[in-house]
């Protein structure tokens, strides 16, 4: 019997190391100051100007080209149809684990992209606002599964994205407070036809979950509304380390606020804080990463692969 030959599957991505990716910056100017960068970085994530220059400037150049190409496509469609409908925002989805640095990535890209002349208005929305309120999670017995797919009001999220993509003049998103760990009642973030909308969160690349009560939920994929998607990746052992470090720092900041949901953790010792944070990671965030977030990495158009020091080691760009 002839032995079957194994033919490795070709990767759908082109992989760049830092030097190769940095060269793609070309002549893109650095339009962010040291002071601005210090305000954009995460609590325990020391972002350097070198990182911005080597990684995020080339990425902003790539996204600018995508936005320009999409704008031309929309204009061609309008010309063909003979109408002059309002502009449609270019939507970028950024996914990744808790504590991996996707929020910092989103803020830096928002700042850099807003400095390009052809799309000065760039808004940023997080998917935290589409979590169910704590009362709903408690009633359903899934409070400890906050961040898992079933904890999101997917219908509201899809309606929001649909309204934005439809070019409505104003679309409102709920606001989530990390201080009180809940949706803020009667508070909204209003999106008014930006040139670019960045949507950042755990679930932006996740496939639909079946819902027998709403056929639309089972048919529509959230990522259908995105023009470009990014996944921020790191090994779980590194993310856990960053999560524990951030948890310890929060004892002196957010946790010390009397209105904080986590104020009971403010007085923990280093050893106690490490134990509590590791337990939360094991039970909730780590499990969610392995079960629901990491499997969506292959759906992204671009992957930022970070090393232990938070610096991006390589970039993978999906082939067209």
Swiss-Prot record:
**TM spans (from-to):** none
InterPro entries attached here? Answer: P-loop_NTPase, PanK, PRK/URK
- For this protein, the Enzyme Commission number is 2.7.1.33
Record keywords: ATP-binding, Coenzyme A biosynthesis, Cytoplasm, Kinase, Nucleotide-binding, Transferase
From the UniProt record, which GO molecular function terms apply?
Answer: ATP binding; pantothenate kinase activity
Q: Which residues form the signal peptide?
A: none
Q: What reaction gets catalysed by this protein?
A: (R)-pantothenate + ATP = (R)-4'-phosphopantothenate + ADP + H(+)
Hey, which family's this protein in? Belongs to the prokaryotic pantothenate kinase family.
What is the protein name given in its UniProt record? Pantothenate kinase
Q: Name the gene behind this protein.
A: coaA
């Amino acid at each position: 019997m002839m032995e079957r030959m194994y033919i490795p599957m070709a990767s759908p991505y082109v992989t760049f190391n830092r030097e190769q990716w940095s060269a793609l910056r070309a002549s893109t100017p650095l339009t962010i100051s040291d002071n601005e960068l210090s305000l954009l970085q995460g609590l325990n994530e020391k972002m350097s100007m070198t990182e911005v220059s080597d990684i995020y400037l080339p990425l902003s150049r790539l996204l600018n080209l995508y936005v320009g190409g999409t704008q031309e496509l929309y204009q061609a469609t309008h010309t063909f149809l003979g109408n002059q409908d309002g502009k449609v925002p270019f939507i970028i989805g950024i996914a990744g684990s808790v504590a991996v640095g996707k929020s910092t990535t989103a803020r830096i890209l928002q700042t850099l992209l807003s400095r390009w002349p052809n799309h000065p208005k760039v808004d940023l929305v997080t998917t935290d606002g589409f979590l169910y309120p704590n009362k709903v999670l408690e009633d359903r017995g899934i409070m400890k599964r906050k961040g898992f797919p079933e904890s999101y009001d997917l219908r509201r999220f899809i309606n929001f994205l649909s309204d934005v993509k439809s070019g409505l003049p104003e679309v409102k998103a709920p606001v989530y407070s990390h201080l009180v760990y809940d949706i803020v009642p009667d508070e909204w973030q209003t999106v008014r036809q930006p040139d670019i909308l960045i949507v950042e969160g755990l679930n932006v690349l996740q496939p639909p979950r079946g819902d027998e009560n709403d056929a639309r939920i089972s048919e529509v994929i959230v990522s259908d509304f995105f023009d470009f998607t990014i996944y921020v990746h790191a090994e779980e052992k590194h993310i856990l380390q960053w999560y524990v470090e951030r948890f310890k720092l929060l004892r002196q900041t957010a946790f010390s606020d009397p209105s904080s949901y986590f104020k009971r953790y403010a007085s923990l010792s280093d050893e106690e804080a490490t134990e509590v944070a590791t337990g939360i990671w094991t039970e909730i965030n780590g499990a969610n990463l392995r079960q629901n977030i990491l499997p969506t990495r292959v759906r992204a158009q671009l992957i930022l692969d970070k090393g232990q020091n938070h610096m991006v080691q390589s970039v993978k760009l999906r082939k067209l």
